[in-house]
Amino acid sequence: MIAFCTHDPEYGFELWCLDVEERRAWCIAPKLRLNSVCGDPFVWLSDSKRVVAKFVIEDVELPVKNTVPTGPIVEESSEGEIRANRTYQDLLKDEHDVALFKHYTTSQLELIDVRSRERKKLGTPLSFRKASPSPDGKYLLVDIIQEPYSYLLPASRFGHSVEIWDTETGDVVETVATIPLQEKIPLAFDGVSDGPRSIGWRADVDATLYWAEAQDGGDPNVDASVRDAVFTLPAPFNGLPRRLLSLAWRYAGMIWGDDNTALAYERWYKTRSIRTHLLTPGGDLETALAEGNGPCCGRKADPSQAEALNRLLIDVKNWEDRYNDPGTILTMMNERGKPVIRLVYPEGNKPADGSETVEPSFLVQCPGASDEGDMPYLAVMDTIEAKQQIVWRSKPPLLENALNILESDEETGLPKRLLLKRESPEENPNLFIAELPEDLFENGEPQITQALTAFPHPALELKDVKRKIVTYEREDGVKLNASLFVPAGYDAARDGPLKMFMWAYPREFKSATFAGQMRDSPLRFNRLARTPLYWLTRGYAILDGPLMPVIGEGDTEPNDTYVEQLVSSAKAAVDYVVKEGIAKRCVPRRILSKPVLDPACFLCRV
């Protein structure tokens, strides 16, 4: 079954369910509006029979603003800690904004059987950020926004409490953490709050919490050998947490597999580096009982439990280097609807339950970037040296992407059928089912067995336009590239220069070498969307996405020479198209940080 929302602009969101086999849809909660202001408005339980949904409180009127001032607006600076902070837009401005925020974020949690439509209220109306069920469905991890709010910070930094509720009754089982207003986060990349964060459920077991916590006060400028640690705590949540892993860099996520396999990511923004650790998390172990009734995350770790065995698996020195991108390790949904690592055993030695541990392999998906453009592929990665063996790859003249694995071999876990998206510059992306050859490592050709869609070209007037990825250099030697579009049938030698749009946006880099790498494919469909390509029908040329890298190598910050580099990149693009005879300068002067407008030029007048 599929649960989904319908939206009526005059009413709001309603919750519906679709039985695919019966081909029947029905409204689960008639005359009740979902609250989608914060987080997902509903979530399935693992039994696939019930959902937990957030509903609007219908009998509460919208706060009305008092047009008569109650007094002057006073901003007071009292004694306290001096710290730098970012500036944000669209913040709460007065008491009426506070009342509106509370009104729109407040909702009622309800447990609903999707077939019988039986509903049960859970707890009282609160400002819920999220409600996440445990894999076994017995508990809800509930995140609640707390007052007082702030006039200086966005809602994502408001104080909040995290609790575990009983799914059946809505009773509070344990308080996980009480997190204050996040006004002391260091103003630096990799600066984080000093306390628990990224609280969630371990996906491969019944009900185990995990979270990360800074060990350096959240300040990346402080010298520390351990910056973050990951902790776990199993149900019934009355014990001491286990310190699962210590990290030298900033925690960047976890993917769970089973008791023997999990992945932990750490990153360091200053060097654009990310590392992947392979660890053996183990099962849920009994822990010493906690003394008192403090929040779960406030308890000291159980000293009798050792950290998980782990080793470095992937070390990405600079994530800006697309040509050496190791790819993304694939996950799959387990029987409880939670994402876990997709483990494969190419030798067919998948262990039976209770047998000795066999080292698994992973499936990875990679963009396959190179100077010729992206050529996506799937590969098997061993967990010893992270070496890859390609099992499927996109090949010209089409650009293909594997969207999902539809069927896997029962013995090896290797893919047998794929859901592919195929496209070309002239062909709209469409979906196909592909059967992979029996011996994946012999590079046999996949067989397309079924076309699922046949979307036509959305604008036949633009089907024959020409697109070419062009390369050129900036004054400082940085290699740049862009997508050049010209009208159908255009010949520069015959037709002369055209008027041209350049559609660009700058981006920061730490490496000049990686800044000029190809970040697209010449085989990609010429999408329209919100682009200037429509002007091709009026005889314009388009230089789409010319690289505008702002580079700060070493200790240099990109913004130190932002304007100079931006001007240099624009000048290089203009010089290229003028040299090739595709366009000409409408103003016979050099490019400046302040534009010089030509009153005779249509675009300048606009």
Language-model regions: role of each:
Residues 1-447, 457-464, 514-517:
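Beta-propeller folds
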Residues 137, 146-149, 204, 255-260, ...:
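Serine-hydrolase catalytic core recognition
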